A protein has these predicted regions:
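Extracellular or lumenal secretory-pathway regions
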Residues: 1-81, 150, 155-162, 168-174, ...
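Generic ordered-secondary-structure signal
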Residues: 107, 203-205
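Membrane-embedded transmembrane helical bundles of large multi-pass transporters/channels
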Residues: 176-198
């Protein structure tokens, strides 16, 4: 489930590439009476802004609530092994984000996806690894052959370590919730069984 936060990813490559993601909560643009989450991203190359993006997002699905199609910068909880519509802000285009297979990053099992963006002014291959239960981004690479920058950009070790730490925290919370759900079901089942035993005894008496 998405929540208000701010993070910056650093990429190693021919130039200093960063992407800052900001999730805020406030009145919805379409219905000011309701609260909504807004996801905003800023991509910088050597400090200069080369792309900006902002949209209201469904906290459960990670999809935009209106205005455009395609996932932005996170995948849903429990991502599926299939293609997703993916929005690239540099090309202002929605393209397929195809499932490649399973992988590992920092000891965490991932699902790997790739997207090809090809327009006259921009061509790139983007590959991402997300933690298979939470959908949190753990690794990413851009191979750009045409556009405002060129070359291979990979997520820095610092950003990968921070992402892995956050994903591990999410996984622990998820496991705790699963244990609590199991215990709750078990207690409920025992309570029903005890009530049944009491009922049988009363009828015998």
């Amino acid at each position: 489930m998405l929540a208000p936060t701010e993070s910056t990813l650093l990429f190693d490559g021919p130039s200093a590439l960063t992407r800052t993601l900001l999730i805020t909560e406030g009145p919805s643009e379409t219905n000011p009476q309701k609260q909504a989450l807004t996801m905003s991203a800023t991509v910088r190359n050597d400090g200069a802004v080369i792309a900006e993006d902002s949209f209201e997002v469904n906290p459960a699905s990670a999809y935009p609530t209106s205005g455009r199609q395609g996932l932005g910068y996170v995948l849903p909880y429990n991502p599926e092994r299939r293609s997703y519509p993916f929005y690239d802000p540099l090309a202002d285009l929605v393209v397929p984000l195809d499932y490649l297979g399973a992988g590992w990053v920092a000891g965490l099992e991932t699902y790997r996806y790739t997207a090809t963006i090809d327009v006259p002014e921009y061509h790139a291959e983007r590959t991402i690894d997300v933690e298979r239960r939470t959908g949190r981004l753990l690794d990413e690479s851009w191979t750009i052959t045409r556009g405002p920058l060129k070359g291979l950009y990979t997520l820095s070790d610092e950003s990968k370590a921070a992402a892995a730490s956050a994903a591990l925290h999410d996984v622990h919370i998820l496991k705790s919730l699963q244990v609590m759900a199991f215990v709750t079901r078990l207690v409920s089942a025992l309570a029903l069984f005890y009530a049944f035993v009491l009922l049988v005894r009363r009828r015998r008496d």
